[in-house]
Design a protein with these regions (language model features):
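Histidine-dependent nucleotide/RNA phosphoesterase domain, centered on the 2H-phosphoesterase fold
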Residues: 1-219
Length: 219
């Protein structure tokens, strides 16, 4: 289980270090991602927990509220050499938007916090619409000669809230804070639209963004 693996690595002071976050150079990788934004009350609740973690391990990287998101699918995983023409991007927008427009809004409950070997995650429960959306994207986009190149097939729904940039100096205290929030309820919400973005690995630099509504949403 990912949480057990993460806890073992942290106890051994051997987390997976994200060295790009330690570089003064901006992240040059770009990817095409379909993601969901968090409502303000959920982001605020997560930030309260991140303040608690930062008090124990200030040397790590913690996502700011605007950067928090749920990755629905990495259509083209972020890499250094990704280049999309305006025509290619328009084709993805049209095709993905058409699929999203047939899917009902997705209901979410974010509750609990776990660690992977390289990150801290807030876990989510969600409606069956998410799996159906992913299935259709994986089958219908390639049929339209629009490649799908995921880093790995996304099957869960979570929010990455922190990444490790250094060994954790107080692993027991850090893991205690994670355990304290293992059942924390960060909030319920309904996702009425998704964003199709070209962005860097950490969602700090967004170069292109279009909002795609679910079926029946007039927002």
């Amino acid at each position: 289980m990912i949480n057990d693996q993460g806890r073992r690595r942290i106890r051994a002071r051997q987390p997976e270090i994200d060295r790009r976050l330690r570089s003064p150079r901006p992240d040059g990788r770009r990817g095409l991602t379909l993601l969901g934004r968090l409502p303000a009350h959920v982001s605020r609740n997560i930030e309260f927990t991140l303040q608690q973690l930062a008090a124990v391990a200030p040397e790590q990287y913690y996502y700011s509220s605007p950067d928090l998101h749920i990755t629905v699918m990495d259509l083209l995983a972020a890499r250094d050499d990704l280049r999309l023409s305006a025509k290619q991007l328009a084709r993805y927008r049209a095709a993905v938007g058409k699929i999203v427009a047939t899917i009902p809004p997705i209901h979410w409950r974010l509750q609990g916090m776990i660690v992977s070997p390289g990150a801290v995650l807030v876990t989510g429960d969600y409606g069956p619409e998410l799996a159906e959306l992913r299935r259709r994207l994986r089958s219908e986009l390639p049929a339209l000669h629009l490649p799908v190149a995921e880093r790995y097939p996304t099957v869960s729904g979570h929010v990455t809230v922190a990444r490790f940039t250094h060994p954790i100096s107080a692993p027991d205290r850090f893991l205690a804070a994670i355990k304290e929030n293992a059942t924390t309820n960060y909030g319920h919400f309904t996702m009425h639209a998704l964003d199709l973005v070209v962005h860097d690995w950490y969602n700090r630099q967004v170069e292109s963004c279009v909002r795609l509504p679910f079926v029946g949403d007039g927002r």
